[in-house]
Amino acid sequence: MSKLPLRDRLVVLTRPEGRGADWKDALVEAGAVVSELPLLEIKFEPDDTVLSEVLDAMGEYDWVVFTSANGVRGFFDRFFERFTDIRSVGGVRFACLGPATEKALRQYHLDSDLTATQNDALSLGRELMTKHDVENQKLLVVTGNLNTPELPRLLADGAMAIVDVIKVYATEEKSVAESPEAAEFRRRGADAIVFASPSAVESFLHQAASLRPDAGARQPKAVAIGATTADALRKAGIPLAGTASAPTAKAIRDAVVAALA
């Protein structure tokens, strides 16, 4: 691999604003010109009644399970509106889905007791059940509005755990048709466009008419962050050029390099 395998390549990231800075850094270090087209936005809107009940019961939980970095941020932002001392979490243990979630947890000076080796919620549940006895233990699953109920169901039915669920954020489509970023994308196109979730793929499809590169512009190759997003691209009929082996900046950079080789 040359020192700058992405020299002068234009790569578009579709993550929400303020997310994926390490992805951008890794791509820029490889020589890419990176632009952002945030197809989604994150809103932190937990149900206040449910959240109050959860915080009242913090000392009762054996595990808190986070499915995303957004879940970590959304939960602790509200946690510190109630408490001033991180020790108020009690003796709870933490499980995280993926390295980005683990990294977000460490920002609160907390370590993950279990981080899933694969980037899907059911793998996290199976690892938790296999490596720890959670039968009759009380678990809190912190998640968002688009997550399926499969993980809580697995833990409740498969591990016989007592499971509470709180949704602390919502992922919503962001209209970018009139944005400067969309105008630039139409004018220049891109060599690659990176999708980080099925919902980003869906948002792209809904806005496809306003995101079509002009004649003569570069036609981007689609790169997925993982298998679930790759499946969403295939189902949408978007040719898949590459899939990252893990949801990390290095793996995403390597997938883009391979797709454009």
Where on the chain are the PLM-derived regions?
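Signature of uroporphyrinogen-III synthase
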Residues: M1-A261
